[in-house]
Amino acid sequence: MGKGSSKGHTPREAKDNLKSTQLLSVIDAISEGPIEGPVDGLKSVLLNSTPVLDTEGNTNISGVTVVFRAGEQEQTPPEGFESSGSETVLGTEVKYDTPITRTITSANIDRLRFTFGVQALVETTSKGDRNPSEVRLLVQIQRNGGWVTEKDITIKGKTTSQYLASVVMGNLPPRPFNIRMRRMTPDSTTDQLQNKTLWSSYTEIIDVKQCYPNTALVGVQVDSEQFGSQQVSRNYHLRGRILQVPSNYNPQTRQYSGIWDGTFKPAYSNNMAWCLWDMLTHPRYGMGKRLGAADVDKWALYVIGQYCDQSVPDGFGGTEPRITCNAYLTTQRKAWDVLSDFCSAMRCMPVWNGQTLTFVQDRPSDKTWTYNRSNVVMPDDGAPFRYSFSALKDRHNAVEVNWIDPNNGWETATELVEDTQAIARYGRNVTKMDAFGCTSRGQAHRAGLWLIKTELLETQTVDFSVGAEGLRHVPGDVIEICDDDYAGISTGGRVLAVNSQTRTLTLDREITLPSSGTALISLVDGSGNPVSVEVQSVTDGVKVKVSRVPDGVAEYSVWELKLPTLRQRLFRCVSIRENDDGTYAITAVQHVPEKEAIVDNGAHFDGEQSGTVNGVTPPAVQHLTAEVTADSGEYQVLARWDTPKVVKGVSFLLRLTVTADDGSERLVSTARTTETTYRFTQLALGNYRLTVRAVNAWGQQGDPASVSFRIAAPAAPSRIELTPGYFQITATPHLAVYDPTVQFEFWFSEKQIADIRQVETSTRYLGTALYWIAASINIKPGHDYYFYIRSVNTVGKSAFVEAVGRASDDAEGYLDFFKGKITESHLGKELLEKVELTEDNASRLEEFSKEWKDASDKWNAMWAVKIEQTKDGKHYVAGIGLSMEDTEEGKLSQFLVAANRIAFIDPANGNETPMFVAQGNQIFMNDVFLKRLTAPTITSGGNPPAFSLTPDGKLTAKNADISGSVNANSGTLSNVTIAENCTINGTLRAEKIVGDIVKAASAAFPRQRESSVDWPSGTRTVTVTDDHPFDRQIVVLPLTFRGSKRTVSGRTTYSMCYLKVLMNGAVIYDGAANEAVQVFSRIVDMPAGRGNVILTFTLTSTRHSADIPPYTFASDVQVMVIKKQALGISVV
């Protein structure tokens, strides 16, 4: 820390004695009610991630009151929460001259709570001591138009961090009314006194017992002192809403008994299907006002709910439900987005089938219909089935799944799911996803694996069109595609004839059977269901004998050939669109039934995760630091870190890298430790990066933490802040990038050092610290003093940086400074000490002299004369004294006078006029000769003063005669005459210029147009204003004009062009031109004071004939005005 430069002094710091003590009382609205409630009482209530009770039932946090309400329609108000408050956060600084005012408009409030405080409260003395301080605030309410002080508050003590307090006020005036916070202590103007005050918030309190119907809530009261300056966060482990579940369903065992009759019963369940049903049909928080229960397909959800409850391997050797929903819906979102989250987690999609909202799940199911070339629309190109494939970049083989881990404080965990074979073949292609409502690692793994297998296995999309048969399935149904072009053989068609007696079918196209294996043919029976029968023989390629003919097989029905070497091609319909011609366009994506078994049995985890907080889930590393030290020319780094909680069975991996010359990172060292500290030794200079992460015995890794540090000489200070004080200057260096290992060397000089290399030999070394207070009676106001500062650390030192500053120029402040010094001295105490006189109007004359040594062996001596008198109960004193004292600044001699008036009189030649008088905080002198004067404000005599200079640099003078140079950056001049030459190096901008300049104007003649021909015709007028005090000349620049000649069939015609020019109405030119060009120009004198000059230019043309327009030309009118006898040019 900083040190003084006069003598050795160790700064003292008083203890912080201001601590915020507030009772946190909060009601958290948890959910739309009713809900099941806490899982395990107070063990399920966590404050700042710490349960109120531990797993053994012992108290972790004392003094906590928790009240729970399930959210029934009729529930009792929570006890201890009889008032309801609405807090308005301000966080506004309150300054001395700027009270903060707010208006209260709420009509129903009963009380107001003001929360206010200080950001810090500490005073630093000139010796570096940090002491308590105080600040005063007023809380005021405007009553009957005037401000009334309700609370007068003084905050007294010391704190280096924010301190808040609060007051509550009742008896409020009628609404609306104004409230304000006012600071009575002047604002600090220096860093030595930190006492910024703030109005943190105000709370409008209503004294009413509320029961909060249909709202599940938790009320918590806790003393915030247990949490220091931290914000108290609340988390609750709860079972959620009481849902409507099927009447034959047991949510605890997840068993369905008998046949469901379609009725419901209330129960808690985390089955995602019934959570979705609740959201869609609930009239308050869900979509029940737009969708009735009859508009949602509960039978489809019943099947999906059973699918979600089926047990699958959990990856640890046990089983768990396939899909559960443990989620909080905490923000308002679009209904479709929430619906999509639910459906994607259940591997289904919502479909409106025209009557109800139903759901189609991506799971194995029977095919609904078969399509081949015979029952689809055949396009002109002969390819009815059009295929598209997903891009390779969209086929991910690794996915990072974010899910909520109950064993890690319900924090977000990431499960990495990979397909190693696909990675080896295509390279790693990673994506990320959030598993909605997932609190199971196995479910998160299945969600990621489902995404990978869907993208890798189901890569095809088919589009085709059908007739009325397009209505045989709906979106979501599985269909089969038998495409002869894709298979390379005939795989489907129509049955032309059926002979049930001979079991022979006549097909519409030839088929070929394999040499081995059993071939099957699929036919449609009378119920519309596909039936497969064995093919026994084929005659003539189209007559097929089968093992049996299903009942109801009709002519022109569809057949499909199944061969042992031909895989069945299944697709799931995703859309059906009606075309303009009455056909239907179908889009379907590839369906692989085996995907479900691959996914549900694909999770295999090593080890078993514990269900306790002190399990083996590796925690995150936090608060990582690296401290560099030197040892015999070599450098060491001590790394320290901690974790949010103590976790058994974990160690820490450390990885240290250094930045190479090419910018890449080179590995220096790795280490593993079970401690939270580690020391690296024998490190070279360079820029390092250290990464630490926790790892458990099974190789699972927690979130890492990294810190960068530098083993090198420090950078020089980027800037130096110099703060003036009374006979002192505080120097505070700043680095461009904060480095806690860096301190600063301070060197001091009263003169500037021309060569920075001579700092150590030509200046005085002050010391090494983070800042320095250079304090001495020799540091005078109005003089420049120079600091030379460089950064130092264990590796080396930076270059010096120069800073120049001055002591304070606050004269009034110096008087207060001296007042403290004088009253603390022995002589000052003797002169100002009051003696109790026994009678009124009594007086006392005393002369005294003393000489002594105190306990610190300091020598002191004084002599003084003092007169005291008491009159009308008031004490008066006059005195004069001399002293010599030993002080901390050294030997000090004083001459003090105590009097209302001090004067010096020269009585020579009978003169009685004093040459110097001091009275009433003013000094009067007739004639003063000074070598140097420092005065923030200078004012001359007169009313108003003829001359003044203010501290902000504003100079005011009625008349100034400056014989030297004037340098100015900005300003305004009025009615100024420049007697001689003026040079302008920059840009000159003038609204109006009168003088030796040239003005010009130009314009083209108007034009007439006929068909595609246009020609000049019309008048232009130029007006020259008589606004100059000297003679000028008007110059008409050459104006050219001409007509044209035309010869057709030996006959010649002319189009003539005529120009007439007038000056003030008199013709000065009248000319005509055929095909030969004519030119007009003129110079006209314009004497000053004769009035304006008006020039009129008129141009006309003649036609070649009645039906042939003129072909004429004229240049622009151009006029210049110049001074008649211009400077800088002459003709001899």
Curated annotation (Swiss-Prot):
User: Cellular location of this protein?
Assistant: Virion; Host cytoplasm
Source taxon at top rank: Viruses
Start and end of every Fibronectin type-III domain? 618-711, 712-807
Signal peptide (UniProt feature, chain positions)? none
Q: Which GO terms describe its biological process?
A: entry receptor-mediated virion attachment to host cell; receptor-mediated virion attachment to host cell; symbiont genome ejection through host cell envelope, long flexible tail mechanism; viral tail assembly; virion attachment to host cell
Looking at the UniProt record for this protein, which Gene Ontology cellular component terms does it annotate, in alphabetical order? host cell cytoplasm; virus tail
Q: Which UniProt keywords apply?
A: Host cytoplasm, Host-virus interaction, Late protein, Repeat, Viral attachment to host cell, Viral attachment to host entry receptor, Viral genome ejection through host cell envelope, Viral long flexible tail ejection system, Viral penetration into host cytoplasm, Viral release from host cell, Viral tail assembly, Viral tail protein, Virion, Virus entry into host cell
Q: Where is this region: Interaction with host LamB?
A: 883-1132
Similarity annotation: Belongs to the Caudoviricetes tip attachment protein J family.
Per UniProt, subunit arrangement is: Interacts with host LamB.
Describe its function. Attaches the virion to the host receptor LamB, inducing viral DNA ejection. During tail assembly, initiates distal tail tip assembly by interacting with gpI, gpL and gpK. During virus entry to host cell, binds strongly to host LamB in an irreversible attachment. The binding induces structural changes in the tail leading to viral DNA injection through LamB trimeric pore.
**Name of the protein:** Tip attachment protein J
Protein's organism: Escherichia phage lambda
What lineage does the source organism belong to? Viruses, Duplodnaviria, Heunggongvirae, Uroviricota, Caudoviricetes
**What gene codes for this chain?**
J
